[in-house]
């Protein structure tokens, strides 16, 4: 059973992208990967609808790249493995566009899309504004061989 709003990656795995500033949608995931600042994490976890399911956080400032790129790659790979195994997974940042779109593009790479085509794939299949900055686009192009935030 998939999550409402989930998209299908080229390898058949399903993932839901969303914005944490929006109300939590219907459908409880088995696992969530959340992208944001420590402040955002505190705010989300203080809400009535805070994630009660297994989840991880990546410190990833808005319009930027992850603070610990190698750790982010490990968590993105783990998210993909869970999705391939049939778990209901989601990825989310504040608005659900730039950082979330960047991770969805990285998931597309893991699902077989050439890294040079992954941003276009995410914009076609997830959100037309996915991957908002030039450095996010470069990060996807180098994924999963990313060793730095720059």
Predicted regions and their residues:
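Short cysteine clusters
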Residues: 93
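Conserved G/P- and acidic residue-centered "switch" motifs that form tight phosphate/ATP-binding loops
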Residues: 96
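Ser/Thr-glycine-rich phosphate-binding loops at phosphate-binding pockets of nucleotides
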Residues: 100
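Cys-dependent protein tyrosine phosphatase-like superfamily
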Residues: 1-90, 103-150
